[in-house]
Amino acid sequence: MIDNDRFRTENIGRHLLGFHDVSQNKVEAVANYLRSIRPEREVETYSDDFQNVFENCNEKLNTCSALFLCTGDAMTEKFVIDAFHSDNMKQPTFILWLEPFGIAGHLVYINPMQMPKNFVLYKDKGSMLYKYNLLAPIEYEINADRFTKKDAGCNGEYALYSGNDVTLMLSAFYPYINKLIQQPEQSKCYRWVGNIKLAQEKGFKLTIEVSSTTIGHVEELPL
């Protein structure tokens, strides 16, 4: 596990950890949580930026069976994609994140052995908005302050969604992740439909017609 952040009170509503873990390094606290459930489990942690760990421990990282990138940070995701394009990333990678308010969840599966050349995930380099977002691009432009909340005492910010949204998304994606780990396939994307009724209530524009889908639906899309 790699993360240079510390656990804060505002993280509690959507995390495995609780009040007794506040101010601890997230990776160390999560590692202790996992060991408390499975003492025999081997958990290795890095309290650092992914970019630094990749540069300093690239050989070791590339021995892993898969990489799960769950930062929600576009620059880290771009770093990983650039590493694929330059042939420096060798292991299958799963990129997961939720859109604000849990309106949609996304899974990008990249298999370095079966991926299109020079693939892109974003509509354009300027906005760095994912090409399969359910929220319309204009909503990210005009509602940026409504979609994120700043961490108290630091310069970071995070999208608004609940722990329940995370559980629902992961439950929907798990069968696909398990299958792809066991039987690697062509690189692809998946989109989980979440709180679209909430999007309607708040008047948010979507990139699809609500009548064309259902809550909980998982759609496979090309990388």
Question: Each predicted region: which residue ranges?
Answer:
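The conserved SAM/SAH-binding core of class I Rossmann-like methyltransferase domains
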Residues: 2-4, 96
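Glycine-rich phosphate-binding loop and adjoining beta1-alpha1-beta2 segment
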Residues: 4-41
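Hydrophobic pocket-lining residues within nucleotide cofactor-binding pockets
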Residues: 12, 50, 98
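Short low-complexity, flexible loop/linker segments enriched in glycine and/or proline
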Residues: 15-16, 59, 109-110
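S-adenosyl-L-methionine
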Residues: 32-57
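Short beta->alpha linker loops
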Residues: 49, 71-72
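Glycine-rich phosphate/adenylate-binding loop
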Residues: 62-66, 72-223
